[in-house]
Amino acid sequence: MRTDSSKMTDVESGVANFASSARAGRRNALPDIQSSAATDGTSDLPLKLEALSVKEDAKEKDEKTTQDQLEKPQNEEK
């Protein structure tokens, strides 16, 4: 299938972007990854992981659901 050379397809534009980026492959992407990750460090990792805990949220939700069920018996829901 031939296309008009003045029109670029999505693939061709991606190839042109890659060629103009001066990256020859995956190995050249490694410094990009390392530079963005190296700024954070791991010293604050335990604090970040602690902030991600969802156990308390789930416990509070279960307690609220239980409390709602006690306040409104099942026969009133129908």
From Swiss-Prot:
Tagged with keyword 4Fe-4S: no
Entry's family note: Belongs to the PKI family.
Pfam families: PKI
Highest taxon in the source lineage: Eukaryota
Site feature (Important for inhibition) residues: R23, R26, R27
UniProt GO MF annotations: cAMP-dependent protein kinase inhibitor activity
Biological process annotations from GO: positive regulation of telomere maintenance
Record flagged with keyword rRNA processing: no
Keywords linked to the UniProt accession: Protein kinase inhibitor
Role this protein plays: Extremely potent competitive inhibitor of cAMP-dependent protein kinase activity, this protein interacts with the catalytic subunit of the enzyme after the cAMP-induced dissociation of its regulatory chains.
GO CC, any one term: nucleus
InterPro entries the record matches: cAMP_dep_PKI (IPR004171)
Source organism of this protein record: Homo sapiens
UniProt feature, compositional bias: Basic and acidic residues: 1-10, 53-78
Region (Disordered) residue spans: 1-78
Protein name per Swiss-Prot or TrEMBL: cAMP-dependent protein kinase inhibitor beta
Polar residues biased stretches: 33-42
